[in-house]
Amino acid sequence: ISTRPSPTTADDVLHDMDGRIAAVIDGGPCQIGLESTVVGIEGEEIVIYRPGGTTKEALSVIAPTTVDSALAKDGAHPKAPGMKYRHYAPSAPLTVYTGEADKVVEEILSFAEKTDKKYGFFVSEETARLLPKGLPLFVWGQREDKESFAHNLFSGLLYFNRHPVDAIIGEGTDTAGLGLAIMNRLTKASGYHIVVEKR
C-alpha cells in the first residue's frame, strides 16, 4: 500500500483497504489533497525535504528557503519519508507531459488516436475538451488552478486503479507555488517518466 497513491476520500480508503478494516469515519475529502510540507533548518536556511501544501514561496517570507537537491534525482536519498523510493504509483504506467502548453496538448492528443494500448488521460479541463468522447478520463481542474490539481491529484491516480487502462497519459504543470509539490508527486508516481515539451 505504501507505494500507491495516497487516499484522500473515505471511498478511496475503503477501496484501498479492501475488507481489511471494519469501517471508516468519513470527514469529507481532504481539503488540500497533498501531505504536509516537511522541512529542516540548515544554517540560516529552511530546506524543503518534501514539498506539500505549504509552498516554498510562503516559507521564503520567514527565511531563505531552498529545496533538497536529492528530490530531483532518481536514485538519490532524500531525507523525508516517502521520497526514497517509487511512491504514489497507480497500477498502470504513467507518463507526464509538461512545458509549453500547445506542445503538451498536441502530444497528449496524439495518444487519443493510438490503438496499440488502452490509454487513460489525466488532464486539465482545457485539454479534456479537445479529446474524443468516451475515452477513460479524469479531469483534475482548470489548467491554472493548482489548488484543484493538488486537491484531485491522488483521487485521479486512484481512479485508474478502479478503471484499469494499459497506460496513463498525464498533463503536468509548472513548479511555481503548489506546482512544486504536484510535480514532485507526479515524478514519483511516474517513476521519473516526465517529458518536458519545448517550442
Task: Give the residues covered by each predicted segment.
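Active-site-adjacent structural elements in enzyme catalytic cores
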Residues: 1-199
